[in-house]
């Protein structure tokens, strides 16, 4: 879905495809929003990664260097961003792919080590499951029929994710270099099919890290260690956020409490006055400190709460993992940090050069000029990410931040891509309307979330408009409760990031269809863009499609055609059967079963273990061996192909009359006949 057709266009970037399908103006406009959304979205990555290493490795917040006191946060970010820029500059997408492949092969056994260590430390039936089940009604972590009271991560959050998977397919371009990296469209599709089995122990490890951290912090058997981790985390987070002198009293009170265990009248007052929406009975120390900081600065209190919650599991893991495994996990995180930085910086830098600078310039660069400009822009992306991370204060969950910044582009990008690849009636006007509406809604959400506490809510209260706004906003969400529950409170914007994202997406789909139908005069030549029929390039294999009959229907469903080898067929069938029989089949059976006779929580705990640990564990053992051998073999094949590859300097991303520059001669020859 989308992957195959996109590769058939032979576009190197999404912007190039947009100019082929719509217009040059739309390519530049879309790339501007795309790069703005992507670069800002990525710009928080270095902050999260650096802060993780500081808390997990217990690094000091400041270090002295020749008499200068420097923030460790900035030094760690600078170190990893510099390493990523060097890797990207050495060889671009090829270097990134090779580096990622090698790091991936090296990481497989390390993932397994961390997984085994966590399973040895915590028993599923004795430690993890009882802790996960000990939740208030409507906030279950295991029973999907009992999550009505989860405000931010409930069924609506899942629904928006599913909706986005369909309507925003391929829209996110953080890894856009890989979308055009395969040797042909068939291999691009098979690479996506292989991805079903690729994750292996990585998925298990990520899941177990979260469950183990939660168990450690909330199970009474680990209460002593959890208390120490919480105190250490709170003290470090306060010093991280509250560097100004106005917070000295807060830090003094906290330090006294941590040293003596006695609560002063001031602390008692803060503890009694907690009024934040996200207060947690399991985190009284965090809430107490947050209340004390809010007296001086509500925004700083929000930042403290966000960082405290983000670093809670990393701090717990430092207390959980044994010596040796702690270092293994740290090495894994460094691998993943560099891998992510290289891929994202290359993607956003390429989009800026290829889809903004190149079409605005209107004429070709020399290969040397283009490569030099790419390196400079990629370094600029790294510099922006460094300073943004250094100065930006997080006020939302990380996933929520990704959702709202991504919505600047994703709010309207999906219909432009899916419609452009599959619908001949889509027009430039429809695409412009979709992207514009999605961007406005998303940016409006960002501004509202950022200014709600200090400006919008106080202004509404002072002008007497608060009552009317409360009635309208809360009334709009009432039919969708408990999944969508908007409450007008002083400390947080009532509509969360995922809800803003969905509103933008839905608006985009409706606008794309309506405006395209109103402005479309003729159908687009899809065969020319996809290089099909008479437009097929020399040397490319012609795909033979079987007629749809009862005997061929099953192959049609799987997309099997003349390009499939025996290995491809086996792989496709394995993924289809796993997804349909195990994945979707279990969903249908469990939904019907629980609608008739609801499972007890203990059954859900056992099912979670089987579905997320036992079966993936078996797959992980096989895929670790399979991808280690196969990855090494494919690396060898890649280098062999690169030795014989012929360069075409016309294939530089330019588009002439809806046709890529390197295809112009071929199209004229075909249409001239």
Where are these predicted regions, by residue range?
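Membrane-embedded helix-loop-helix hairpins and adjacent transmembrane boundary segments
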Residues: 1-630, 647-651, 671
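Cytosolic juxtamembrane helix at the C-terminal end of the final transmembrane segment
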Residues: 520, 631-642
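Solvent-exposed, non-transmembrane helices and loops of integral membrane proteins
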Residues: 644-667
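Long, low-complexity, intrinsically disordered segments
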Residues: 667-673
């Amino acid at each position: 879905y989308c992957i195959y057709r996109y590769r058939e266009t032979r576009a190197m970037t999404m912007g190039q495809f947009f100019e082929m399908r719509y217009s040059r103006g739309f390519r530049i406009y879309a790339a501007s929003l795309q790069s703005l959304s992507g670069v800002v979205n990525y710009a928080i990555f270095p902050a999260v990664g650096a802060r993780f290493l500081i808390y997990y490795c217990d690094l000091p917040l400041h270090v002295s260097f020749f008499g200068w006191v420097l923030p460790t946060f900035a030094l760690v970010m600078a170190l990893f961003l510099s390493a990523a820029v060097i890797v990207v500059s050495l060889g671009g997408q090829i270097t990134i792919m090779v580096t990622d492949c090698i790091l991936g092969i090296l990481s497989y056994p390390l993932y397994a080590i961390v997984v085994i260590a966590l399973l040895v430390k915590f028993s599923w039936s004795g430690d993890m499951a009882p802790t996960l089940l000990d939740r208030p009604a409507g906030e279950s972590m295991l029973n999907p029929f009992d999550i009505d009271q989860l405000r931010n991560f409930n069924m609506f959050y899942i629904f928006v994710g599913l909706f986005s998977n369909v309507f925003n397919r391929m829209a996110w371009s953080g890894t856009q270099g890989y979308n055009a990296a395969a040797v042909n469209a068939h291999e691009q599709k098979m690479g996506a099919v292989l991805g079903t089995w690729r994750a292996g122990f990585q998925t298990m490890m990520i899941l177990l890290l979260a469950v183990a951290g939660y168990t450690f912090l909330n199970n009474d058997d680990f209460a002593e260690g959890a208390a120490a981790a919480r105190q250490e985390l709170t003290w470090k987070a306060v010093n991280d956020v509250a560097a100004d002198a106005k917070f000295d009293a807060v830090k003094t009170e906290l330090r006294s409490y941590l040293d003596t265990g006695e609560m002063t009248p001031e602390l008692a007052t803060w503890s009694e006055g907690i009024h934040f929406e996200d207060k947690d009975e399991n985190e009284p120390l965090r809430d107490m400190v947050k209340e004390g900081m809010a007296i001086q600065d509500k925004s700083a209190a929000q930042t403290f709460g966000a960082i405290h919650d983000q670093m809670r599991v990393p701090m717990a893991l430092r207390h959980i993992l044994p010596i040796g495994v702690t270092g293994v996990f740290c090495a894994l995180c460094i691998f993943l940090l560099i891998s992510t930085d290289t891929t994202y910086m290359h993607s956003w830098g390429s989009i800026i050069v290829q889809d903004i600078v190149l079409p605005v310039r209107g004429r070709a660069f020399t290969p040397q000029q283009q490569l030099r400009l790419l390196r400079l822009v990629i370094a600029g992306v790294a510099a922006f990410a460094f300073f943004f991370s250094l100065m930006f204060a997080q006020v939302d969950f990380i996933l929520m931040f990704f959702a709202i910044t991504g919505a600047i582009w994703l709010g309207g990008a999906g219909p432009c891509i899916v419609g452009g690849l599959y619908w001949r009636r889509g027009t430039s006007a429809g695409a412009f309307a979709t992207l514009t509406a999605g961007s406005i809604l998303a940016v409006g959400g960002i501004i509202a979330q950022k200014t709600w506490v200090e400006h919008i809510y106080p202004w509404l209260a002072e002008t007497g408009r608060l009552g009317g706004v409360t009635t309208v906003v809360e009334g709009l969400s009432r039919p969708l409760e408990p999944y969508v529950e908007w409450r007008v409170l002083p400390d947080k914007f009532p509509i969360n990031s995922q809800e803003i994202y969905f509103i933008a997406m839905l608006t985009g789909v409706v606008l794309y269809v309506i405006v395209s139908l109103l402005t479309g005069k003729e159908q687009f030549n899809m065969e020319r863009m996809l290089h099909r029929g008479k437009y097929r390039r020399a040397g490319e294999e012609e795909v033979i499609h079987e007629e749809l009959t009862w005997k061929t229907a099953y192959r049609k469903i799987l997309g099997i055609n003349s390009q499939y080898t025996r290995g491809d067929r086996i792989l496709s069938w394995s993924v289809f059967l796993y997804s349909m029989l195990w994945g979707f089949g279990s969903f249908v059976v469990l939904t019907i079963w629980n609608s008739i006779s609801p499972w007890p929580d203990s059954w859900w705990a056992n099912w979670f273990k089987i579905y997320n640990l036992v079966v993936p564990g078996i797959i992980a053992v096989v895929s670790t061996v399979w991808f280690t051998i196969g990855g090494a073999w494919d690396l060898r094949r890649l280098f062999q192909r690169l030795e014989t590859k012929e360069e075409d300097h016309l294939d530089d991303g330019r588009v002439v009359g809806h046709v890529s520059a390197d295809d112009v001669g071929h199209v004229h020859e075909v249409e001239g006949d």
